[in-house]
């Protein structure tokens, strides 16, 4: 068992997948910016923290559940660990319902809080209203992928993320450039792209017969454990948005939409770098969780050092 080959097999697809996620954030801004100018690009950038919040919820819950599932499976077998998969899916459903139901009524106040006014506010609200309605696809797409990786499906995880990414590009071109649907069209393209990823992820769960059906006994204790582990990946994924929100607000105040659009280009480049680093960590996590559960602490430590 060569740890370097194992690490490469898991980490390389993960890094590529997260690189795609970084470009995913750019696609809407690229098409909207070329079609609608600074106002459209600024609106997308100001609204992005809300998109990131939903994706961070999915990432946190998915990582939390998949880590515990991998550890439990390594120590007690697949049957005993199955409850964590079911608990994770149920928590993703709860988060999706809460996000769609709660954020839909708050898109306006949130945009005002982040400094959006005038045309930027109108375009940003059009974008967020559609994004929030599709919250379930954002959350499930990012939440199921860690489960797939922890089942040894790193390449499949890359494939489903790539399918959603390509769908988003094609639909952005149609909705924004051809049909001229503006920011609402860009949001619809993003939601449909995430829907494609979600459907592919569920296909994997069913095809590989993962324990998605069964007893929910012990759900509350498992949910608490998942929430504790989920706090860290959620915070790490969402924390860069704090600086983005502050910079956007001060940019609007001091430089207007041109300043926000300028910083959006910088933020996109930073996002790709951040995603590449996160890809290394997320790619190594399934191996560390598995070896820890199997009691192979030396191997787990070696994977950690390689990462």
Regions found by a protein language model. Give the residues of each.
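Loop-to-helix entry region at the N-terminal start of transmembrane alpha-helices
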Residues: 2, 9-13, 43-47, 126, ...
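Helix-terminus/linker motif at the lipid-water interface of multi-pass membrane proteins
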Residues: 23-42, 111-118, 174-181, 241-272, ...
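Generic alpha-helical transmembrane segments of integral inner-membrane proteins
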Residues: 15, 19, 23, 27, ...
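Small-residue-rich hydrophobic transmembrane alpha-helices
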Residues: 41-101, 138-157, 262-307
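Short alpha-helical transmembrane segments in multi-pass integral membrane proteins
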Residues: 1-14, 69-136, 178-231, 288-307
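Acidic, glycine-rich loop-and-beta core segments that form the ion-binding/anion-interacting portion
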Residues: 210-241, 247-267
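Signature of the first transmembrane helix
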Residues: 5-66, 231-252
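Short runs within selected transmembrane alpha-helices of multi-pass transporters and secretion channels
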Residues: 62, 130-149, 157-168, 186-201, ...
């Amino acid at each position: 068992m060569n740890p370097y080959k194992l690490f490469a097999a898991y980490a390389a697809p993960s890094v590529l997948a997260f690189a795609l996620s970084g470009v995913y954030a750019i696609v809407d801004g690229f098409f909207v910016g070329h079609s609608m100018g600074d106002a459209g690009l600024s609106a997308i950038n100001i609204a992005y923290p809300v998109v990131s919040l939903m994706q961070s919820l999915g990432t946190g819950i998915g990582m939390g559940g998949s880590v515990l599932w991998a550890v439990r499976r390594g120590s007690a077998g697949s049957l005993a660990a199955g409850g964590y998969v079911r608990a994770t899916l149920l928590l993703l459903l709860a988060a999706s319902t809460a996000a769609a139901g709660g954020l839909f009524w708050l898109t306006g106040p949130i945009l005002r809080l982040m400094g959006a006014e005038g045309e930027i506010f109108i375009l940003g609200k059009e974008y967020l209203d559609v994004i929030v309605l599709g919250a379930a696809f954002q959350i499930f797409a990012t939440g199921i992928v860690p489960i797939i990786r922890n089942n040894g499906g790193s390449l499949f995880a890359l494939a489903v993320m790539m399918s959603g990414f390509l769908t988003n590009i094609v639909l952005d071109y149609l909705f924004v450039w051809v049909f001229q649907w503006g920011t609402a069209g860009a949001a619809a393209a993003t939601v449909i792209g995430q829907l494609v990823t979600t459907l592919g992820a569920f296909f994997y769960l069913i095809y590989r017969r993962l324990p998605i059906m069964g007893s929910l006994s012990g759900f509350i204790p498992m949910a608490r454990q998942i929430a504790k582990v989920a706090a860290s990946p959620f915070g790490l994924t969402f924390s860069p948005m704090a600086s983005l929100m502050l910079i956007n607000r001060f940019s609007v105040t001091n430089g207007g939409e041109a300043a926000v659009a300028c910083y959006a280009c910088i933020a996109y480049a930073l996002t790709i770098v951040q995603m590449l680093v996160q890809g290394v960590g997320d790619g190594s996590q399934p191996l560390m969780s598995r070896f820890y559960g199997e009691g192979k602490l030396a191997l787990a430590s070696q994977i950690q050092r390689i990462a």
